[in-house]
């Protein structure tokens, strides 16, 4: 069913690209395939199929102006995809992507190669779009678009890595919180707990506060301490004394 939907969407994009690019090169089917590639990346990255996209890449490069424009469209498509993800999932989406990048760079050499291809794809697109496309060999450009196609073909694998990275990150954060953070809070709490009564004793001895004020401060301190300990027991599981 998903394959049928993807095929229908592909045909729809072809029709749309004919309409919006008809005045430019309506009879140039290869150019239409270029537009299809960028439209798919921009609006439906989850329906990309790496093999199909690679077959749609033209066998020759057209004019520099068209090439620049097409690369700009691709970059805009990538940006739209990121913006759409942020709007849909909030800024937590950015953290998931960062976790994914870290995971990609640390899991294995294969993942590092894939990650490098994706980065190279964006770099080559930007170079061709804003600098001199004549300096780029066709094989390099093909590799760049192949990286984007790989991104589309491996979207499920990427989602798996993102989920796995989230789980690993959560586990690492939990471990760090359980050891470093809680121990620091515990030691800080002990220091404050022992220091504050001595501080009040000094104030009383120097006559800064009266006996009545001292008693009121001790009561207030004891009340706050009890509330803190209760919250710690419920939320952070810090042991009582």
From Swiss-Prot:
The lineage of its organism: Archaea, Methanobacteriati, Methanobacteriota, Methanomada group, Methanococci. Disulfide bonds: none annotated. The keyword Kinase does not apply. The chain crosses the membrane at residues 7-27, 37-57, 72-92, 110-130, 138-158. GO terms for cellular component: plasma membrane. It is found in: Cell membrane. It is a multi-pass membrane protein. The keyword Transport does not apply. It comes from the Archaea. Keywords: Cell membrane, Membrane, Transmembrane, Transmembrane helix. This is Uncharacterized protein MJ0998.
């Amino acid at each position: 069913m998903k394959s049928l939907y993807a095929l229908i969407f592909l045909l729809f994009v072809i029709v749309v690209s004919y309409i919006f690019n008809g005045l430019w090169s309506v009879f140039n089917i290869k150019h239409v395939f270029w537009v299809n590639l960028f439209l798919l990346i921009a609006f439906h990255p989850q329906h990309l199929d790496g093999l199909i996209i690679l077959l749609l890449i033209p066998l020759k490069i057209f004019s520099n102006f068209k090439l620049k424009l097409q690369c700009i469209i691709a970059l805009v498509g990538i940006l739209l995809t990121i913006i759409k993800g942020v709007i849909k999932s909030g800024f937590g989406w950015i953290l998931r992507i960062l976790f994914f990048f870290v995971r990609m760079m640390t899991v294995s050499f294969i993942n590092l190669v894939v990650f490098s291809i994706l980065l190279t794809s964006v770099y080559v697109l930007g170079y061709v779009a804003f600098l001199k496309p004549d300096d780029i060999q066709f094989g390099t450009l093909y590799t760049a678009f192949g990286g984007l196609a790989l991104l589309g073909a491996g979207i499920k694998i990427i989602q798996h890595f993102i989920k796995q990275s989230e789980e690993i990150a959560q586990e690492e954060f939990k471990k760090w919180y359980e050891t470093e953070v809680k121990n620091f809070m515990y030691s800080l709490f002990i220091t404050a707990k022992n220091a504050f009564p001595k501080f009040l004793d000094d104030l009383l001895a120097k006559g800064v506060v009266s006996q009545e004020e001292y008693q009121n401060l001790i009561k207030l301190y004891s009340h706050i301490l009890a509330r803190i300990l209760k919250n710690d027991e419920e939320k952070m599981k810090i042991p009582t004394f």
